[in-house]
């Protein structure tokens, strides 16, 4: 039997995903917890690849460091 008064309360909780899926569970953190991705919308589980905007990052990198010349030995 666990000691009385030292364990957190284990209450009803709701997990809400960005895709609209809602999961009812129990947790020591009661209330609503919002998550960005879940098993219903994660590419690993759905088999669909989402295209990430990596081109913007590459362009930003090249804009910042693209014209830098390599250092020469002295």
From Swiss-Prot:
Binds 1 zinc ion per subunit. Zn(2+) binds at residues 17, 19, 38, 41. SUPFAM superfamilies: L28p-like (SSF143800). Part of the 50S ribosomal subunit. Belongs to the bacterial ribosomal protein bL31 family. Type A subfamily. HAMAP family: Ribosomal_bL31_1. Binds the 23S rRNA. This is Large ribosomal subunit protein bL31. The gene is rpmE.
